[in-house]
């Protein structure tokens, strides 16, 4: 049921009796390219009010999860990519200059937001080391006084596109962004203003916008796309719920055609190299009392589904089976006492061969970044070769990936990934197979750069897990996903998660049923909570 009454929502918001979760439901749309994806779709987005939750809607394509925001008193509508691998929100200015990204440099790979750092590593680590503990943030009132004097410049924290063609076999690589040469970089228009097709923000028409007295915002991604603009803060509305004075950047020049809503750790904000962090969306939701903890749970749903969700401040027990097991995030740099990326240890990767035998293809415990900004997954060369061998794949120079038997798309075999030594997630091999042509299938796992200190799991692996990201305590909790439309949402208190069990079960056919729910005591608030459900339409692009 769609909520049409703003007055009713206002009354509910005023009557908040406890911290409420903030939920983003995402709708999935698919097409041959981004151009054949109309805002209209045969599936109707759901806007539903629930006690104790605030819903935002996401949509999945190749895999882009796009949220619709309304910014400022003029409520300019912007659709932005939702990304766990980066931490900053930036949108397009209404009068920005669209430029083409350089496409001559093709010796770097696009891994998804939050990866592929090109900035001088030693300098960056020293600047981050000089930060106070993460509790030291620049508060909104300090921003209003413009006390921070920084130059927000960051090179290489990821890429909007994760499409990679390995043209020289394992050990060598080159990149290909789907829009380079035609629309520029990661969707840039090569000079026309089609890069505002997903919305823009006119600061002059907003009575509530305040510009920071700082140097320019500037970010560049590994595929050479970039954005330059200003920093400011304004009210941002998601469905009918408004987050007051949210900090974000407004690009006045970019080679990308869509902005980004980064919800990662504050240590990955572009301002960290200048000595401070600020409250991005998860932190601001907590600071404003909308949620009790900077925590969100991720449910991507099946590869062909039309909906999934990110739930802030709460857990949906219907969306997983068994127990949620908590794993500490890994420190990104030894010189820094806290994590910068959402990176967790993977201790084992078991692959079942066609003969039924199981092989561990991981030589030792390895750090893995969990990144919704990446469609595919990336592992080190030896791991990739072992995976390809176990699946009887053949590396193809012409295709630029491992070619596998298309029968694997219907296989019931799994890749079993052990996180932190105590939680195994079963990933269907069928989810890792991509249909390259009518008769050719490739493996959707690529080689990670040998210069990287971590591997990366994108959506084709993450959708098999129900994942809870705790940004306050630097923890990730995982359970095997249960695909279902049912819900059993509970708010998480300030003390965090204790042992919780899911109410969902998955049958051999992949459908879901519901059993009685066993929830832990402690920090899980089981009493009714009056809150808002924020539904936000997010379009996801599958480019083939």
From Swiss-Prot:
Disulfide bonds join 98-195, 406-441. Its main location: membrane. The chain crosses the membrane at residues 524-544. A lipid is attached at residue 520 (GPI-anchor amidated serine). Optimum pH is 5.5 using casein-resorufin as substrate, and 6.0-7.0, the pH of the saliva, for cleavage of Hst 5. Residues 31-50, 500-519 are annotated as: Disordered. GO terms for cellular component: cell surface; extracellular region; extracellular vesicle; fungal-type cell wall; membrane; plasma membrane; side of membrane. The keyword Hydrolase applies. One of its GO terms (biological process) is fungal-type cell wall organization. The GPI-anchor is attached to the protein in the endoplasmic reticulum and serves to target the protein to the cell surface. There, the glucosamine-inositol phospholipid moiety is cleaved off and the GPI-modified mannoprotein is covalently attached via its lipidless GPI glycan remnant to the 1,6-beta-glucan of the outer cell wall layer. The keyword Ribonucleoprotein does not apply. Glycans are attached at residues 212, 240, 252, 422, 499. Residues 521-544 form a propeptide. Pepstatin A binds at residues 83-85, 371-375. It comes from the Eukaryota. Keywords: Aspartyl protease, Cell membrane, Cell wall, Cleavage on pair of basic residues, Disulfide bond, Glycoprotein, GPI-anchor, Hydrolase, Lipoprotein, Membrane, Protease, Repeat, Secreted, Signal, Transmembrane, Transmembrane helix, Virulence, Zymogen. Its EC number is 3.4.23.24. Residues 65-479 form the Peptidase A1 domain. The active site is at 83, 371. Induction: Induced by fluconazole. Expression is regulated by growth phase, temperature, and white-opaque switch. Monomer. This is Secreted aspartic protease 9. It comes from Candida albicans (strain SC5314 / ATCC MYA-2876).
């Amino acid at each position: 049921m769609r909520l049409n009454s703003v007055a009713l929502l206002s009354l509910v918001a005023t009557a908040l009796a406890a911290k409420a979760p903030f939920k983003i439901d995402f709708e999935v749309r698919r097409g041959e390219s981004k151009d054949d994806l109309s805002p209209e779709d045969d599936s109707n987005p759901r806007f539903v009010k629930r006690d104790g939750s605030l819903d935002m809607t996401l949509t999945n394509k190749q895999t882009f999860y796009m949220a619709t925001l309304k910014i400022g008193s003029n409520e300019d509508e912007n659709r932005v990519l939702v990304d766990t691998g980066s931490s900053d929100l930036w949108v397009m200015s209404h009068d920005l200059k669209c430029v083409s990204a350089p496409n001559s440099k093709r010796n770097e790979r696009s891994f998804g937001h939050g990866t592929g750092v090109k900035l001088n590593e030693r300098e960056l680590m020293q600047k981050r080391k000089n930060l106070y503990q993460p509790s030291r943030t620049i508060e909104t009132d300090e921003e209003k006084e413009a006390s921070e004097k920084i130059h927000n410049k960051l090179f290489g924290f990821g890429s909007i596109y994760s499409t990679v063609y390995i043209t020289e076999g394992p050990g060598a690589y080159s990149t290909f962004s789907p829009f380079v040469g035609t629309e520029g970089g990661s969707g840039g228009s090569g000079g026309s203003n089609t890069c505002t097709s997903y919305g823009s923000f006119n600061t002059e028409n907003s009575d509530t916008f305040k510009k920071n007295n700082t140097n320019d915002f500037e970010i560049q991604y590994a595929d050479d796309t970039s954005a330059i603009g200003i920093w400011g803060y304004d009210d941002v509305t998601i469905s009918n719920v408004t987050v007051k004075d949210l900090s974000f950047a407004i690009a006045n020049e970019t080679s990308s055609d869509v902005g980004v809503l980064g919800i990662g750790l504050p240590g990955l904000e572009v301002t960290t190299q200048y000595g401070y962090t600020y409250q991005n969306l998860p932190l601001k939701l907590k600071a404003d009392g909308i949620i009790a903890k900077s925590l969100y749970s991720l449910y991507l749903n099946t590869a062909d589904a039309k909906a999934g969700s990110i739930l802030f401040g709460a857990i949906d027990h219907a969306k997983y089976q068994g127990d949620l097991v908590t794993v500490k995030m890994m420190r990104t740099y030894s010189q820094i006492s806290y994590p910068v990326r959402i990176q967790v240890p993977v201790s084992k990767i078991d692959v079942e061969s066609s003969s039924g035998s199981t092989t561990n293809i991981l030589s030792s415990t390895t750090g893995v970044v969990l990144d919704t900004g990446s469609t595919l997954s990336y592992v080190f060369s030896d791991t990739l070769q072992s995976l390809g061998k176990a699946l009887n794949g053949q590396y193809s120079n012409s295709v630029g990936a491992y070619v596998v038997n298309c029968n694997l798309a219907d296989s019931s075999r799994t890749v079993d990934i052990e996180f932190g030594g105590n939680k195994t997630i079963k990933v269907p091999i069928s989810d890792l197979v991509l249909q390259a042509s009518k008769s050719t299938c490739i493996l959707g796992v690529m080689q990670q750069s040998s210069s990287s200190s971590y591997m990366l799991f994108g959506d084709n692996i993450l959708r098999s897990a129900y994942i809870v990201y705790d940004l306050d305590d630097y923890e990730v909790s995982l359970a095997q996903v249960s695909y279902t439309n049912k819900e059993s949402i509970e708010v998480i208190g300030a003390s965090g998660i204790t042992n919780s069990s899911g109410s969902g079960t998955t049958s051999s056919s992949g459908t879901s049923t519901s059993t009685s729910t066993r929830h832990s005591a402690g920090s899980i608030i089981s009493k009714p909570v009056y809150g808002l459900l924020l539904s936000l339409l997010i379009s996801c692009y599958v480019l083939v």
